[in-house]
Amino acid sequence: MPCIMQGFIERPKKVEQGIDFDRKLYIVRRVFEQSADDTYVASLSSRTIAYKGMFLVDQLRLFFPDLQDPDYDSAIALVHSRFSTNTNPSWERAHPNRFIVHNGEINTIRGNADKMLAREETMESSHLKNQLHKILPVVDTRGSDSAMLDNTLEFLVMSGMPLPLAVMITIPEPWTNNKTLDQDERDFYQYYATMMEPWDCLLYTSPSP
């Protein structure tokens, strides 16, 4: 069993709460992850906490004391339980990820991951600015297919894109032969298809501001 530690980071007064603080934490986490091979950060956010492990659902509350505290409160909780089918099970690969839970396999994963990595030379973000190089590579190819999609969504959101838009781009509805779409919807999907290949049903949530 891994050694599990929990820490709390105080928000600097000059940093706004919410996504601005989370963006700083994202950069800190990526720098730490790349400096320590045998560690995994389940979550580092001012708005969400991810509890994960190789458990049955009813064992989760027994393992983490936080979840037994009657004063512990949350607006929403996502729970996922499924054994690995195409990767070896491990604590860090357990769901939830930081943005999504996903029940299934992404058949296009290798192509999606390779193309995300290939784009890194031309990536830029007005929100990450000169910190962008610290979070590369965007996709950790050692993770599961779901984790790699989670990496991509997290990067898009931290770069300033609203989560619903990021999801519509990465996981578009079947639009090519859909005659019910109006021209604006068709133009939307066609435009973003030039920038992002579709990933394969997902459950995701955006934390409260």
What are these language model-derived features?
Residues 1-75, 81, 132-199:
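Extended, highly charged
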Residues 71-106:
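Internal mixed beta-strand/loop scaffold within catalytic domains of large alpha/beta enzymes
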Residues 85-88, 107-108, 114-118, 175-178:
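Flexible loop/turn segments at secondary-structure boundaries
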Residues 91-93, 199-202:
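Short solvent-exposed loop/turn micro-motifs enriched in small/polar/acidic residues
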Residues 93-139:
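Extended active-site and interfacial segments that coordinate phosphate-rich ligands
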Residues 204-209:
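Conserved small/polar residues in nucleotide/adenosyl-binding loops
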